[in-house]
Design a protein with these regions (language model features):
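Single conserved hydrophobic/aromatic residue that forms the stacking wall/gate
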Residues: 1-12
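Functionally critical, mid-to-C-terminal surface segments that flank or help form catalytic/ligand
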Residues: 201, 205-256, 269
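Residue "hotspots" at secondary-structure boundaries inside conserved domains
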Residues: 1, 235-236, 286
Length: 344
């Protein structure tokens, strides 16, 4: 049910139409300040653009059956931070409420799945319980969460994902190489432009996916929002540490796995560790948790190999920025001030 739940929850992010990207050579060096605010950027765009980003939020959540043991809750039809806060907030309330018959919650970008036992609680009774909890949720704008920022060295346009793509083309079906396909689809200048855009923002970890530790993320800077469909059919293998995207979500593959995301980079940094060889895994075998942030930092093959050796001898130290207080209100304020005419 974990795989089914993850796929059902993430579907809303894979069919989002994207406006034409208008980005140029701009590198956003600063991200979040220590007090949780975002750096000021010159702007001639204010409230109207911010409201556009946060459209698509339903006045009331939609409750839909997912077979006889699952309930799907949809909070909207777009991928944005506010909807993820709603999903995470309700998930936390359900855990503390100890509702009889509820086994697990699977929050994602704009929706969540509740796994329950229909012998203990009926479908409509569960909906009534959840509606009651929703009334107790405070306004998202007042929510502040602890958020860790990880810097992940990444080789973009790398030889490993290129090999996987070429193997797929040779054995499965013809397709344009993934970086070129994403570049063309998003009307970017060239693959180097694509790399600048993708690496120009922090990514919000909205949920963990179909494999232990795999993060489903969304870009915090809307100017870096790209889109790409998943493979059809999927690949039979993907290199460990691959960075890829499907819909507008970016993910990191924790291991050598089948996969359907468009792929374009690779990181040597482990994101799950069953043996807990590194201190960051002392509380969990999975590195990330919802609310974390990832910054992909372009690196070359020499740096990749150096980090890989440190990982092998267990001397690698994660590039982790200590937790900050992340505020939706301050994030919205930052959105209202950025210049959407500037390009990466």
């Amino acid at each position: 049910y974990r795989l089914v739940g993850s796929e059902m929850c993430i579907r809303d992010s894979h069919n989002i139409s994207q406006p034409k990207l208008n980005v140029n050579k701009l590198s956003v060096k600063k991200h979040i300040n220590e007090d949780g605010s975002y750096p000021n950027l010159d702007s001639n765009v204010t409230k109207e653009k911010t409201l556009e980003i946060f459209q698509g939020i339903y006045p009331e959540p939609k409750f839909l059956p997912g077979g006889d043991k699952y309930l799907l809750i949809e909070f909207g039809n777009v991928m944005n931070l506010e909807l993820n806060f709603k999903a995470q907030g309700l998930s936390n309330l359900i855990k503390t409420a100890n509702i009889k018959g509820v086994y697990e919650t699977l929050p994602c970008f704009a929706s969540m799945i509740v796994h329950y036992n229909p012998d203990d609680i009926g479908y409509q009774d569960l909906i009534n319980e959840l509606k009651s909890l929703l009334k107790d949720m405070k306004d998202n704008d007042d929510t502040v969460v602890n958020s860790r920022l990880f810097h992940f060295p990444t080789v973009y346009l790398d030889k490993w994902t290129k090999e996987a793509i070429e193997d797929y083309i040779a054995k499965i079906t013809m397709k344009k190489p993934d970086p070129e396909f994403i570049t063309e689809l998003n009307q970017l200048d060239d693959v180097n432009h694509f790399v600048r855009v993708h690496s120009g923002t922090e990514y919000w970890v909205a949920s963990l996916g179909f494999w232990p530790g795999l993060p489903f993320t969304m870009p915090l800077d809307p100017r870096c929002k790209l889109t790409a469909p998943k493979y059809n059919p999927p690949r039979t293998w993907t290199p460990k540490g691959t960075v890829g995207m499907g819909g507008s979500s970016t993910a990191i593959y924790p291991d050598r796995l089948p996969g359907g995301y468009q792929i374009f980079g690779r990181t040597p940094v482990p994101i799950w560790d069953p043996d807990k060889n590194f201190d960051v895994f002392k509380d969990s075998i999975c590195l990330f948790k919802p609310g974390d942030r990832i910054k992909f930092v372009p690196c070359d093959y020499d740096e990749f190999e150096m980090i890989e050796k440190k990982v092998e001898d267990k001397s690698y130290r994660y590039d982790l920025i200590e937790e900050h207080k992340f505020s939706i209100k301050k994030y919205k304020n930052w959105l209202s001030k950025i210049d959407y005419n500037k390009k990466f």
